[in-house]
Amino acid sequence: MHHFFLPTPLSEEALAAPLTFSRKDWQHLFVLRLREGEEFVLADGYGREHICRVTDVQKNSLTASVVESRDSARELDCQLILLQGLPKRDKLELIIQKAVELGASSIVPVMMARSNVRLDDKKADRKAERLAEIAKSAAEQSKRGILPQVASPKRFADAIALAKDADIK
């Protein structure tokens, strides 16, 4: 069954009504050529999954109704936070993809003293957005119920402070 994340969680009232998806915003639903009666999963990113059944397909819209809502059973019992030094080139993208697939709940890129990669604030924000998209895609592919957070790159001292504040059991 196909798995997607909602941009924002829906209220119980919104879930009771038929959901309409526009081609402009949900192109990937149309690419799959879903037909009436087929089902897919919408996750809210906070641990709830909604199984939806397609009720109507038009040229520029798709309508579905929620058949069942449940808690996601695919998450780890603990939170796994990855503090990752910035590697060369695009290796960080692969690292984030695999970390999300393995169950990481949060990923913090760290600028180390000997890292060859240096990012200013503008580049760091763009890089964080790109990495968040990769994390979302990996979470959809591995059918996660929670959308992992990818922080903007931090300095080593800030990452250590973040680790000290973590709830370690």
Give the role of each language-model region.
Residues 73-169:
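RNA substrate-binding interface of SAM-dependent RNA methyltransferases
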Residues 1-71, 122:
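N-terminal positively charged helical leader segments and presequences
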